[in-house]
Swiss-Prot record:
PANTHER family: SIMILAR TO RIKEN CDNA 1700025G04 GENE. Keywords: Phosphoprotein. Residues 1-28, 60-81 are annotated as: Disordered. It comes from Mus musculus (Mouse). This is Uncharacterized protein C1orf21 homolog. The modification Phosphoserine is found at residues 95, 115. InterPro entries: DUF4612. Transmembrane segments: none annotated.
Length: 121
């Protein structure tokens, strides 16, 4: 019951502000860092549609390759339950797409020479 009165927005004025006609509300003391800022445009947002088309094409190719290899495995071995069926209508979130995009870039670049195997101390 006491919480409802605490939720009211209070205005505070000192003598100088009262003379100038300026009143502050709660939250005015915070600087610009807390105000809403526009979203910065980053690389993957600029080429989003183009990149998504490339990724979708690559994913489709991989699904087709996977489907053909899965059917070959199934006909050769005839072991049910060990071969996963491809999902044609799989939903992939943006974060997953970004992860796989970064993974593809890392694979294309080659081996990372600052790996855990080497002691760099």
């Amino acid at each position: 019951m006491g919480c409802a009165s605490a939720k009211h927005v209070a205005t505070v004025q000192n003598e100088e502000e009262a003379q100038r006609g300026k009143s502050y509300q709660n939250g005015d003391v915070f600087g610009d860092e807390y105000r809403i800022k526009p979203v910065e445009e980053v690389k993957y947002m600029k080429n989003g549609a183009e990149e998504e088309q490339k990724i979708a094409a690559r994913n489709q190719e991989n699904l087709e390759k996977s489907a053909s290899s899965n059917t070959r495995l199934k006909t050769n071995k005839e072991i049910p339950g060990l071969v996963h069926q491809p999902r044609a209508n799989m939903h992939i979130s943006e974060s997953q797409q970004e992860f796989f995009r970064m993974l593809d870039e890392k694979i294309e670049k080659g081996r990372d020479y600052c790996s855990e195997e080497e002691d760099i101390t």
